[in-house]
Amino acid sequence: MARFVVAGPSEYLAITGWGIDDVKLAKKAWVFAGQKCSRFDISPVNYEFNVEAMSSEKLAFNLPAVFTIGPKITPAPAPEVDGASNQRRVLMPESEEKLLLYAKLIAPHDHASNHVKQLVKGVIEGETRVLAASMTMEEIFQGTKKFKQEVFDQVQLDLNKFGLYIYNANVKQLVDEPGHEYFSYLGKKTQQEAANKAKVDVAEERMKGEVGAKEREGLTRQNAAKVDAETKVVSVRQQGIGLREEAKVKAEVQVYENEREAEIAAAQAGLAMKKAGWEKQSKVAQVEAVKAVAIREAELQMEVERKNALRLTEKLKAEQLSKATVQYETQVQESNAALYNRQKAADATLYEQVKSAEARKAQADAMFFEQKLAEDARLYAKQKEAEALAMVGKAKVEYVTSMLQALGGDYGALRDYLMIDGGMYQEMARVNASAVSGMQPKISIWSGADGAAGEAGAGAMQQVAGVYKMLPPLLSTVHEQTGMQPPAWMGSLPKDGAN
């Protein structure tokens, strides 16, 4: 059986069933057999919450808030064609879509159900806690307006999924959790700072009155002395400028010639330095890649320890900073007042002395500038000479490195070669000869082939064998007298007791 149903001024009808694909919204409609009609109120509702959140330093606080929330309704404009007012749309398409979401949310529940309130509360508390956990307590307190706006925006994004709109959001002042007195301490600190500032302002105004009269008298004397001193300074300065410009031109010519010679040497040195730098960067990059993981682990551990230290520091600071700040500022203001009186008394005398010194300084600067340019030219030439010596040293390093590689990394063979090439053995022989000159050193004589070297019938092989037999005692004697070891390629000293 059909019946005609009309919704109230702040109500809508949600009709489902026979002949309707999803949900039909209407202010009035015929409801036929096989259809179900539900009324739902679209009036905004106030939701009061007391959100308990925690900052990134684990400081708890309360955030009282009142949100006015309901479905967003935007009536469609009346059509321009006359006589079509009965056929116009009730809602704008976007509002009708959001109202459908709201109808599906609230229709299964009773009008007095707490379902929507619990949903809204869960969204607000969740977004508030997530946002607060990413900020410090100082950031939340200093940027309260920004914090409230971000909470509002994040909550609205989530409520859009249910067709709800925040008509008004009133987030009250942040409140301390029981047992946490962060905001209370901040309030006491502000009150004490205001009282101290008032005391300082009174003292400053009294000081300005007494100092003002003295300043006027001092300025009159200072200005007279200033004019006389500036006249003398200008005269001396003009003479110094002329001498300085002349010396500057001469020095620039000399510097230009030195620079041209230096650029040629620098270009050659730069190429060699770049090659070495590229090789160094390649090796450093490999080492850095290996060490990066260990460094990152250490940094993360340091960050955890730093956060713990900051939390303890903030707690102690809140307890002790207020008293220390008041005492410090009071002592500073008293010291500043006494210091200001002494400084003003000394300024007048100092000003006249400074101006006289500036005149003498300007004349000395001209002479110093001329000497400095000459010294700079000599210094530049010496620097380039040092760079050339450095390049020679680098070439020697590369030569030694290439020789070491050619000898297969045998450091002893390289050392022997360098000593032979540098005439070290000849020099050592000369020094040893001079050291034993006039002495009677131990002299050992060995005969080849057991004293048979003089026989006419001895063969060549016996002579060679005799030479080899003489080498061990010869090397031992050299070691005893000079402490030098034979080269590795020649052989080694005989062990104690060996023949």
Curated annotation (Swiss-Prot):
Chief localization: membrane
Pfam families: Band_7
SUPFAM superfamilies membership: Band 7/SPFH domain
S-palmitoyl cysteine lipid modification positions: 37
Keyword field: Cell membrane, Coiled coil, Lipoprotein, Membrane, Palmitate
Post-translational changes noted in the entry: May be palmitoylated.
InterPro entries named in the record: Band_7, Band_7/SPFH_dom_sf, Flotillin_fam
Keyword Protein transport attached: no
One GO cellular component term noted in the UniProt record for this chain: plasma membrane
Location(s) in or outside the cell: Cell membrane; Membrane, Caveola
UniProt cross-references to Gene3D superfamilies, sorted A to Z: Band 7 domain
Coiled-coil features, chain-numbered ranges: 243-319
Bilayer disposition of the protein: Lipid-anchor
Sequence similarity: Belongs to the band 7/mec-2 family. Flotillin subfamily.
Function description: May act as a scaffolding protein within caveolar membranes, functionally participating in formation of caveolae or caveolae-like vesicles.
Name this polypeptide is given: Flotillin-like protein 2
Gene label: FLOT2
